Amino acid sequence: MSAVVEFRDASYRIGARDILKSLSLRIEPGETLVLLGRSGSGKTTALKMVNGLLFPSSGELLVDGRPTTAWDPVRLKRGIGYVIQDVGLFPHYTVAQNVGLVPRLEGWDEPRIRERVDSLLAQVGLDPAQFAARYPRQLSGGQRQRVGVARALAADPTVLLFDEPFGAVDPVTRLDLQKQFLALRRDFGKTSIFVTHDVREALLLASRIGLLHDGSLELVATPREFQQSTAPEARAFLACLEWQPERQ
């Protein structure tokens, strides 16, 4: 079975600085690959390369078996759902209009769009009767993130990209959103690439974890394998789970 996304010795550099170094990685159908790393490790750069916001300086990146440089840019982006930390909802559009935007651009008829919007809102835990006509300013941070996830799923994309989507909400809401993500993964079976610097989140959500350090892929492992790894960078992240402040 061919990979949905494949990095083939892909590097990205700005001037003399290597942001990503010879990344080779396959993301298989239906899996959630979590890219874990410190700030500046290249996680978001890798994500932007998948949907054609950036292109490899060397090597190549394939989506559905085709190099991103060979895709029509619009078709590539519309085939990928993207969820980011600040959501990026259009403030002058209602929730329903935001979620239905890409299906409308794809030429879906209005009854089909309404059905899809209502179904997705319900699946992310928002009652369509209460939320479809609201504007983003009328939503909490957690509710906006749920709308962002629904929008990403709306046109049935090949792959979903999540760039630290839950980092700006409180811990209780964050756990609720993580549980919702796991439920959606079970229901939709979508291939996902999820970026985080939170090792707890990586262990909870990942099928496999790709550990990036200073632009290099240090380790690819299941959550269980990651917890047993002796790799120094993996141990540094796992130590965050164990540390407790000294009690006076």
Regions found by a protein language model. Name each.
Residues 160-163:
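Catalytic Walker B motif of ABC-type/P-loop ATPase nucleotide-binding domains
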Residues 214-215:
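Conserved ABC ATPase "signature" C-loop
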Residues 134-139, 143:
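Conserved ABC ATPase signature
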Residues 67-81, 105, 110, 226-230:
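ABC ATPase NBD coupling module
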Residues 96-104, 114, 118:
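Short helical segment in ABC ATPase nucleotide-binding domains corresponding to the A-loop/adjacent helical element
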Residues 51:
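Helix-to-loop junction immediately C-terminal to a conserved catalytic motif
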Residues 156:
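Conserved catalytic motifs of ABC-family nucleotide-binding domains
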